[in-house]
């Protein structure tokens, strides 16, 4: 099996490099004009493969360094969505009175070229504030389009400009309630509450949330940038005593650090929690522009004219399965690896889910990370081999997005701002104690009794406005505190 996988990897790299070189020289003049400021190149210094997950026969992002000093990225999919997003983002920036940075792209149907964006520090306090204001605009667009993959590896802090470098999951699928969700009223209201949170700013991936487990086992991950190293709550294979005769593999938690999204003021790392209100200002300004300007909704609807990637299982989970299958005990044959990967199947699974799990296993056997797509006007989900799995979704992504847009309001905006504040608070140093979160309620009466009565009414109104009602039942979202100070 090792021999087969080595041959497979070697062939996929050769095929990809040939494809990249062919595209590079066929578009030489355009690339020189768009990415090189007109400077000519005659060849490459290096092509560095596998700068991301591999899909569909080993295809992945590649870093290309030209002999004129220019570095750019080759991506094995169209970048039309990136261009469309940039136009929308630029429009909102102009409407909210802030500048934006234009990223250079060259897009085709099945691949595209993108300029290299570097992580650079802010020069002054004003730039830091502008950075987080722009993050608020990005957060709103992620919320409006149901994005779920805006984690730290997909956002680069380029001075005062946050730049999103992966748009494959735009637009996402915004969950909607189904009549099949729960047999009892209690189960249905719980499902409604779950859906409300799933469609909120929390699930964009940009805000700090507990990942890879709940409670004390969870790890705080976000795109807001932190200097702290992340320690995985699960074990991964690690090479020990390399370059010696005692080289071996041990399984242990791994420390990792997402560096590209870290914001710095000169050499000082910035704590994003100190700029929560800047994020909220950007979010609210973009939200209010969208409610007032119909052109924004038209531009948003333009994302629903094709397919987008949908995440059915975390990439880290696939990576764990893949790494486990490389253990010497399972590398004896393809059948041995498949026997291990069959753990993906679940007892009593439907024939529908069996087909999806079969595809996941087949992809992992070929060292690919499984990928799925949804079409804006279909209820099907499509796998990376082109297979269609019908009626996976209760309604089409476009229909779901229309329902999402209809519920947008000032009340919803305030609710999302509450989620932002609660989430960002976790970036502050934790003392392990439960925290109180004061809610800003406008209004003040000099008469003490009238003031108390007025504030009570506002609190009651707030509680009622946050209620999730279904049939004859009502529910609310709330916080569950853990010993590590997170919630």
Put a short name on every predicted segment.
Residues 1-147, 161-163:
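Conserved ATP-binding subdomain of kinase catalytic cores across diverse folds
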Residues 1-21, 25, 161-457:
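C-terminal catalytic region of ATP-dependent kinase domains
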Residues 119, 477-480:
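Short amphipathic alpha-helical segments and their helix-coil junctions
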Residues 153-155:
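Hydrophobic residue at the +6 position relative to the catalytic HRD Asp in the kinase catalytic loop
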Residues 455-475:
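Long, well-ordered core segments of solenoidal/helical folds
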Residues 479-487:
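Solvent-exposed loop and edge beta-strand segments that line ligand/cofactor-binding
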